[in-house]
Curated annotation (Swiss-Prot):
<protein>
    <recommendedName>
        <fullName>Fluoride-specific ion channel FluC 2</fullName>
    </recommendedName>
</protein>
<comment type="function">
    <text>Fluoride-specific ion channel. Important for reducing fluoride concentration in the cell, thus reducing its toxicity.</text>
</comment>
<dbReference type="InterPro" id="IPR003691">
    <property type="entry name" value="FluC"/>
</dbReference>
<keyword id="KW-0472">Membrane</keyword>
<comment type="similarity">
    <text>Belongs to the fluoride channel Fluc/FEX (TC 1.A.43) family.</text>
</comment>
<feature type="binding site">
    <location>
        <position position="76"/>
    </location>
    <ligand>
        <name>Na(+)</name>
    </ligand>
</feature>
<keyword id="KW-0479">Metal-binding</keyword>
<keyword id="KW-0406">Ion transport</keyword>
<feature type="transmembrane region" description="Helical">
    <location>
        <begin position="4"/>
        <end position="24"/>
    </location>
</feature>
<dbReference type="GO" id="GO:0046872">
    <property type="term" value="F:metal ion binding"/>
</dbReference>
<keyword id="KW-0813">Transport</keyword>
<feature type="transmembrane region" description="Helical">
    <location>
        <begin position="96"/>
        <end position="116"/>
    </location>
</feature>
<keyword id="KW-1003">Cell membrane</keyword>
<feature type="transmembrane region" description="Helical">
    <location>
        <begin position="38"/>
        <end position="58"/>
    </location>
</feature>
<feature type="binding site">
    <location>
        <position position="73"/>
    </location>
    <ligand>
        <name>Na(+)</name>
    </ligand>
</feature>
<dbReference type="GO" id="GO:0140114">
    <property type="term" value="P:cellular detoxification of fluoride"/>
</dbReference>
<keyword id="KW-1133">Transmembrane helix</keyword>
Length: 122
């Protein structure tokens, strides 16, 4: 694959990942009755599982770049997670802020591990 093709692929596939994040986050947020950022949590946990799965496969360098960096990188969002956690703290919702950190880290690690284990079964 040429460098130009990889760059174009990253741009296009990254666009798909970011649109999917917008759709999933919005759908979850509309159904959640609390100010807790559940949409971002669902996106990041599913992204961790997917990246773990992709990491467990024997992908070529280009395929890993397109699937992992472009799609999953655009789909997941560390910066939004941090901003939403900081806002919970500003609003004095300290338990929710701490829960967002702990749940994201613990379940994110577990999701990545499970994804990787599932890939080894394929």
């Amino acid at each position: 694959m040429t460098t130009v093709a990889v760059w174009v692929g990253v741009a296009l596939i990254g666009g798909v990942g970011s649109v999917l994040r917008f759709v999933v986050d919005g759908a979850v947020a509309r159904r959640a009755s609390r100010p807790f950022p559940l949409g971002t949590l669902v996106v990041n946990l599913s992204g961790a599982a997917l990246l773990g799965f992709l990491g467990g496969l024997a992908l070529s360098r280009e395929a890993a770049l397109l699937a992992g960096t472009a799609f999953v990188g655009a789909y997941t969002t560390f910066s939004t997670w941090m901003l939403e956690t900081q806002r919970l703290g500003e609003e004095r919702q300290l338990r929710a802020a701490l829960a967002n950190i702990v749940v994201s880290v613990v379940l994110g690690g577990a999701a990545a591990f499970i994804g990787q284990q599932l890939a080894q079964l394929v």
